[in-house]
């Protein structure tokens, strides 16, 4: 979802 903030890998 929050790809606009920082690139979090959803684990």
UniProtKB/Swiss-Prot annotation:
It comes from the Eukaryota. Keywords: Amidation, Neuropeptide, Secreted. This is CAPA-Periviscerokinin-1. Its main location: secreted. The modification Valine amide is found at residue 11. It is found in: Secreted. Mediates visceral muscle contractile activity (myotropic activity). GO terms for cellular component: extracellular region. It comes from Striatophasma naukluftense. InterPro entries: Periviscerokinin. The keyword Secreted applies. Coiled coil: none annotated. GO terms for biological process: neuropeptide signaling pathway. Belongs to the periviscerokinin family.
């Amino acid at each position: 979802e929050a790809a606009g903030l920082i690139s979090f890998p959803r684990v």
